[in-house]
Amino acid sequence: MTTEAELSERLSEVEDPIIGEDIVSLGLVRDIQIDGDTATMSLAINSPFAPAEMEIGEQIRETVAEEGLEADLHANVDNIRGFDDEVFPNIRNVIAVASGKGGVGKTTVAANLAAGIDELGARVGLLDADIHGPNVPRILPIDEEPGVMAEQERMVPGVSDGVKIISMDFLTQNQDDPTIMRGPMVNNVMTNFLENVEWGTLDYLVVDLPPGTGDASLDLLQTLPVAGAVIVTTPQQMAVDDARKGLRLFEKHDTPVLGIVENMSTFHCSSCGETHDPFGSGGGEKIAEDYGVENLGALPIHEDYGADGTTDPVVKNEGSDVNDSAVELVESIADRIGEVNRRKAAGILDNTDSGTAFGEQPSGQAKLETKEPDGH
């Protein structure tokens, strides 16, 4: 009969597909116990349905099965986040989406990221923190309107095809009216969004930050247990310069930058058949190279990104010509979050990832799924 030590030795043959070292040496496999035909173990992973972590899980199950055992896997990531306050205690990963300036498609990226991770099978929320330009409900169709839990005086998010959403747009009577607020009022709204929303348990919360590096973004970074940030730019030099400022903001707050997304990268002309670079080229790639962060991908200019809140976002529109690039971007970001978490657990954070402020895992141990669940 296989012993725990022998099974651990076998599992050392399983390699983390991104970090490139075996999962036992990394310390990702913990508390192996064999009882009859079942091998139960804890894994220091925290990015549900990220492709790389799904692959790790499948390789573990195959290895355990070769020993005549059935694997019972649980996520145990008590030391991954390490953030002491109680903001979002039931949310595993907070992903900030930011830009150095407005008009680069930050909200489009945030909305498609949330919808795409939901499509992978995870439980996802989307916080529209851009108080003065709350456009998320105009991109994602709302199936269930937001509400209020009267007894607890807590807001209930709206829902778009499984994604829970909170936005200032829900609180305005006329969508054409500007949000006229000074700093203290904005802070009050954000405090309510952070403390008085019934998110439930989420695997990921995507936060659409305000553009720029002002007080609103600073306050959020000082309050939220952000696992990592995505910076959106266009190839245009002005946008690239401002994106650099945004990147430095996250560095100063010891928040891992998951990578750069270059939006409006190219335009394919259906008339002439040529692909053009209307805003130049290589801006996102250059920032990534200069700062040693990931170049997560480039999204083209395409009419399907002009969602008006009545149709599916590109990432869920399999008939779209640009669906593949959107899905690849989502998977890259999910994998990057997983990599940061596993490096944290293994104690091998590099300079890009060091000093991260993480919070406690909401459920301690969570049973790992083998396939996408039927519901969220």
Regions found by a protein language model. Name each.
Residues 25-98, 373:
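Extreme N-terminal, non-catalytic leader segments
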Residues 1-30, 34, 71:
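N-proximal, solvent-exposed amphipathic alpha-helical segments enriched in charged/polar residues
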